[in-house]
Curated annotation (Swiss-Prot):
Entry-linked CDD domains: RPS2
GO molecular function, one term: structural constituent of ribosome
Keyword rRNA-binding found: no
Listed GO biological process terms: translation
Keywords: Ribonucleoprotein, Ribosomal protein
Residues passing through the membrane, by range: none
Name of the protein described by the UniProt record: Small ribosomal subunit protein uS2
Organism: Thermodesulfovibrio yellowstonii (strain ATCC 51303 / DSM 11347 / YP87)
Keyword Ribonucleoprotein: yes
Stored Gene3D superfamilies: Glucose-6-phosphate isomerase like protein, domain 1, Helix hairpin bin
Family designation: Belongs to the universal ribosomal protein uS2 family.
Length: 261
């Protein structure tokens, strides 16, 4: 059974590209036709792209790898947050701070700073400061929370990244490429597909299209996690059996020694 159907993509408006004059010629092989000055994306290629990205993210997840969802444009913010939370992965849906990947240690320090302010708020020490200082701390806390809440528990560089609109998320793309992190992304007709490892040709402006494709990526991760958990259970079971055998051998050995005495 296919991960997604042409009908679903059509209903979500995933086939609408940008104006012809804004196209990137490298997207030519993903374009089906031109209608009223708008490029129409070949949805057969979209289905194939989704299936390939699905398998990739499922594999990463099945191996226990962490994944990051990125989409800061207004149309993508809700889908990115909702689907990342559903799949239990990290996300950035407000602002990509330069160095989020390439200067990860500094980002971790920002997370720690935010958590310190949160702690001050909880234990009441924040309110020992002047009103002006409290207002300053609160403003900083809100800003840090908005930008970092989706990655606060991310302790290392992710093994894969899923992006909505690689043109908008240019810095995220550059950082991932620099670090050799594979990218799966929705790539519209005005973008360069060569920057992406797993190209999903599609409309990166339509809320329904973004939601549909992002939900499929989340499904892939959840499927991979099931495989990973099953693997862990099997390994734990094997370890328990091995431990039991060793205990029995030790017991038998001690009994043999007792009999000999």
């Amino acid at each position: 059974m296919s991960v997604v159907t042409m009908k679903e993509l059509l209903e979500a408006g995933a086939h609408f590209g940008h104006q012809v004059k804004r196209w990137n010629p490298k997207m030519k092989k993903y374009i089906f036709a031109e209608r009223n000055g708008i490029h129409i994306i070949d949805l057969q290629k979209t289905v194939k792209g989704i299936e390939e990205a699905y398998e990739f993210l499922k594999t990463v997840s099945a191996e226990g790898g962490s994944i990051l969802f990125v989409g800061t444009k207004k149309q993508a913010q809700d889908a990115i947050q909702e689907e990342a939370k559903r799949a239990g992965v990290f996300y950035v849906n407000h602002r990509w701070l330069g160095g989020m990947l390439t200067n990860f240690a500094t980002v971790r320090k920002s997370v720690e700073k935010w958590q310190r302010i949160e702690q001050m708020k909880e234990d009441g020490t924040l309110y020992l400061h002047t009103k002006k200082e409290i207002a300053k701390y609160e403003k900083e806390r809100q800003k840090l929370e908005l930008n970092l809440i989706g990655i606060k528990d991310m302790m290392e560089i992710p093994k894969a990244i899923f992006i909505v609109d690689i043109k908008k998320e240019k810095i995220a793309v550059e950082e991932a490429i620099k670090l050799g992190i594979p990218i799966a992304a929705i790539v519209d007709t005005n973008c360069d597909p060569d920057l992406v490892d797993y190209v999903i040709p599609g409309n990166d402006d339509a809320i329904r299209a973004i939601k549909l494709i992002t939900s499929k990526m989340a499904d892939a991760i959840l499927e991979g996690k099931e495989i990973f958990m099953k693997k862990l259970e099997e390994e734990a079971e094997k370890a328990a059996i091995k431990e039991k055998i060793l205990q029995e051998e030790e017991y038998q050995k001690s009994m043999d020694e007792y009999i000999e005495e």
